[in-house]
């Protein structure tokens, strides 16, 4: 995701309260779950976008940086890969 898009997401986040963004994120997660349950690929893609946007906004409201998320993603991937190798 490029900086221009992140800046737009963050600018919108700054308008709303933390509680509002938390609530919106939960709503979007429910919509994503519904899209997955119905195997509606186009709707699922749209809902993925909504979830990603609102999650980035929640990170901002919590004063967490996206690079902190990157570190957690790396950790989780490493852990999963180690687990998979140990099952071979």
Where would I find each of the regions flagged by the language model?
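Flexible "arm" and connector segments at domain edges
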Residues: 1-88
């Amino acid at each position: 995701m490029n900086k221009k898009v992140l800046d737009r997401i963050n600018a919108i986040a700054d308008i709303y309260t933390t509680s509002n963004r938390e609530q919106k994120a939960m709503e979007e997660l429910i919509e994503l779950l519904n899209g997955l349950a119905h195997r509606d690929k186009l709707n699922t893609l749209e809902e993925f976008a909504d979830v990603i946007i609102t999650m980035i906004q929640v990170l901002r409201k919590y004063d967490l940086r996206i690079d902190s998320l990157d570190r957690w993603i790396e950790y989780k991937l490493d852990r999963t890969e180690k687990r998979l190798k140990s099952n071979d």
